[in-house]
Amino acid sequence: MNRFKAGFGLLAVMALAGCTSEKGKTPADSSASAQTNDHGGLTGAGATFPYPIYSRWFSDYAAKTGVKINYQSIGSGGGIRQLSEGTVDFGASDAPMNDTELAGAKGGPILHFPTVMGAVVVTYNIPGLAAPLRLTPAILADIFAGRVTKWNASAITSLNPGVQLPASDILVVHRTDGSGTTFIFTSYLAATNPAWKAGPGAGKEVAWPVGLGGKGNEGVAGQVKQTPGAIGYIELAYANQNKLPYAAIQNASGAFVVPSIASVTAAAASIADTLSASSDYRISVANAAGKDAYPISSMTWLLVYKNQRDPVKGKELVDFLRWSYETGYETAASLDYAPLPEKLRQRLIARLGMISLGSA
């Protein structure tokens, strides 16, 4: 498993402390990217899910080109709001914008650019448990709905023969902010469980029936780490950074699969063949077919205005995206993200031609 570079060190400290403040509101977020170039650099805001890889990319890109990118890791909902209001140059989200959100954007049409793929993992704090816990989508829905409340419930022990599970309460931990990670997790539950689809349903924010809240992936990781009996959902990189275990989830083929670069890549095996440069890239790979596919996988997106009013910033944004597809992707696996398939990256490079520079 990777260990993040020095610029990301404070994130682990915050998670260990159970801190629930947003990265975008702390000095750590700007450690590698707060400076600006002669004409202001680029500003962005949004998802915490890809913050580790974006932090690395922005630092590497600044070192190569001198273009500084200031990114606030405030959650997908916040990134969509700031882009829609025109206060940042780009947004970032783990949930694609819906039609209503797109229609409300002040700067006109918005394009979705997938950057990497990742996994949302189900992490837990069960002292003494060595092997990965095995869970089905039905059991997950029952736990997060408050219908299964004890770790030694028969619905859980029957999936984990030979494993001694405690008779203690299950404490659910969920996000409190508008979150793409929540969208990925609840979309998966809604896709696999009719009762969950009926309510709470899927979204960046839902009315959780039970549980405690944490802000950002950091906050949820911190809550789970310091609370025996807790269960929550976070991005894979945050689980590895905080040495948190994660469950093997039953996929659409019936196999129990742990999250990994290989199992996330397997979830996207056939995507590239269905897309072109002009496709609508608001797509889902949740509960994908294939015996090796991890079912709670997702793309994450950068969101950019199709018509860039500032030609200098517009070109910088296009150049950065091109760099991410041609070079930046090489660092993804070292930070527990799955790079996009080569064929898909080439189609996204062609898609950059849809961005108009300097037009209102």
Where are the regions a protein language model picked out?
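Bacterial N-terminal signal peptides that target proteins for export
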Residues: 1-8
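Hydrophobic helical h-region of N-terminal Sec-dependent signal peptides
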Residues: 9-13
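Flexible loop/hinge segments at secondary-structure junctions
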Residues: 19-360
